[in-house]
């Protein structure tokens, strides 16, 4: 049984490292978007993109702390070859799905601290998700 838990722990660390890379990529995209904003609502777009970039960096940092706590080594850099989705809603849905999977894995392994971190990230993602029209939208995670 212990070997199975170690295998699951290794899988979880690998999955969390993938999530760290995704969060860093998202932060990078938001920073680029903030720097290239040229619309009439430039200030609002820059504030929103900066806020989302900061949230993604907080998520990556929290996940890196959990990877260290689990005995792993956090992902070191942003993967430049990672495909980037133009559809923010689809990307947001994918993030929620991935974090729900991590939450289940953490629950199965009895990792309460990681569960708390993931719940906090999911809650923050709910607030930061936006539709194409620019209105805030809550995405259900049931």
Show where each model-derived region lies.
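Iron-associated oxidoreductase/ferritin-like identity signal
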Residues: 1-142
